[in-house]
């Protein structure tokens, strides 16, 4: 079950997995954001935690929560942000078992929840956070930097 919010839309989940499989077969670039990251993992055989035990770190009733993350040296996120980045968070689910073809590249040090991965050989990556709405008043991490990198690399 994939559920980026608290509501379930099985028909939408199936459609999104089919769209991902279509893109993957054609080696099209895919950037999964939040539920999109979860969807990629499940579509490739990974599993999810349906309701994480540490919600205070990853969501807030008042909007996005911000927390520190560690980034794997040598990854594209490391090239963009270095070894640490503060990111926004608004999720109650997370990756439990990562699909075999995916490489973990960012995680929350407080609970080891995965925050980003990249595919071993295809132009596919996912982030649990929201680069499109990250606020500079809470972090120096630029979501625009990630989006620009993805577009420049794969457009």
Feature-to-residue mapping (PLM):
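Pocket-forming structural segment of enzyme catalytic cores
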Residues: 44-120, 137, 153
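Acyltransferase
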Residues: 132-155
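Cytosolic ligand/metal-binding cores
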Residues: 38
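Alpha-helical elements of Rossmann-like donor-binding domains used by nucleotide-donor carbohydrate transfer enzymes
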Residues: 18, 76, 112, 145-149
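Conserved G/P- and acidic residue-centered "switch" motifs that form tight phosphate/ATP-binding loops
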Residues: 34
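Flexible gly/pro-rich beta->alpha loop and the following alpha-helix that scaffold active-site loops
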Residues: 1-31, 44-45, 49, 148-152
């Amino acid at each position: 079950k994939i559920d980026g919010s608290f509501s379930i839309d099985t028909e939408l989940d199936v459609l999104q997995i089919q769209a991902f499989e279509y893109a993957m077969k054609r080696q099209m670039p895919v950037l999964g954001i939040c539920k999109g990251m979860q969807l990629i993992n499940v579509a490739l055989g990974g599993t999810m935690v349906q309701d994480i035990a540490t919600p205070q770190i990853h969501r807030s009733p008042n909007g996005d929560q911000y927390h520190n993350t560690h980034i794997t040296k040598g990854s594209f996120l490391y090239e963009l942000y270095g070894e640490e980045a503060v990111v926004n968070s608004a999720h109650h689910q997370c990756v439990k078992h990562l699909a075999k073809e995916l490489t973990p590249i960012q995680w929350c040090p407080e609970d080891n929840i995965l925050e980003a991965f990249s595919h071993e050989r295809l132009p596919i990556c996912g982030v649990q956070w929201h680069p499109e709405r990250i606020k500079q008043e809470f972090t120096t991490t630029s979501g625009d930097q990630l989006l620009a990198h993805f577009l420049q690399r794969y457009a």
